[in-house]
């Protein structure tokens, strides 16, 4: 092995990559150790006596090669939101950013009115008539007046006021 080329075996090979673009098969990685002939030790990218650049840290760094995967996108599939939705006429249309955000927020579906009359709000606070948090001594009946059987959603302020003591 020449001086200045320690830990550089295998970096000249190209084309030996797996399906994700990672190098495979006999590629050894250097550690960026001592470089003879320069009078210095260690360091990334220092030139040896013969002009070989040192790669430190034991990491493979390809020189601006693009790895194509044949047009196949590898996705995790963990997200449930889609960038398009049914347009009602058998086709699809792209969703806007606003629609994507509304889809992820709890209770943000204005088109879905089927669950509001039976289950209450987003966190089930609508039908409770008993004593609220930390309010001992109150007998129920004073908390959900006005929205009990109408199927209307309570506003955020109404929910907060309901939980405050002495505000009825």
Swiss-Prot record:
In its keyword annotation, does this UniProt entry include Cell membrane?
no
How is this protein annotated for GO cellular component? vesicle membrane
Q: Which residues does the annotated region (2 X approximate repeats) include?
A: 94-166
Does Hydrolase count among this protein's keywords? no
Composition bias type Basic and acidic residues, residue spans: 98-114
Q: Could you tell me where the Low complexity compositional bias lies?
A: 115-147
Composition skew (Gly residues), residue ranges: 23-59
A Pfam family annotated for this chain is: Dehydrin
What PTMs does it carry? Answer: Phosphorylated on serines in the serine-cluster region (poly-Ser).
Q: Mark the sequence repeats by their residue spans.
A: 2-10, 94-107, 122-130, 132-140, 153-166
Q: Which InterPro entries match?
A: Dehydrin, Dehydrin_CS
Annotated region (Disordered) at 1-154
**Upregulating conditions:** By abscisic acid (ABA) and water stress.
Residue ranges for the region (3 X approximate repeats) are: 2-140
Example of a GO MF term: phosphatidylinositol binding
Gene Ontology biological-process annotations: cold acclimation; response to abscisic acid; response to water deprivation
The UniProt keyword set, sorted, is:
Phosphoprotein, Repeat, Stress response
Q: Which family does it belong to?
A: Belongs to the plant dehydrin family.
The name this protein goes by in its record: Dehydrin DHN1
Provenance organism: Zea mays (Maize)
């Amino acid at each position: 092995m020449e001086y200045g080329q320690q830990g550089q075996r295998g970096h000249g090979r190209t084309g030996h990559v797996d399906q994700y673009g990672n190098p495979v098969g006999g590629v050894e990685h250097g550690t960026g150790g001592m470089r003879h002939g320069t009078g210095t030790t260690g360091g990334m990218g220092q030139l040896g006596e013969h002009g070989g650049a040192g790669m430190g840290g034991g990491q493979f760094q390809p020189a601006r090669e693009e790895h194509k995967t044949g047009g196949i996108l590898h996705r995790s599939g963990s997200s449930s939101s889609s960038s398009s939705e049914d347009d009602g006429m058998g086709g699809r249309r792209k969703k806007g950013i606003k629609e994507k955000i509304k889809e992820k927020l709890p209770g943000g579906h204005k088109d879905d009115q089927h669950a509001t009359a039976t289950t209450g709000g987003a966190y089930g606070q609508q039908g409770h008539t008993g004593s609220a948090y930390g309010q001992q001594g109150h007998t129920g009946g004073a908390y959900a007046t006005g929205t009990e059987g109408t199927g209307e959603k309570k506003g955020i302020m109404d929910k907060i006021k309901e939980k405050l003591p002495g505000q009825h």
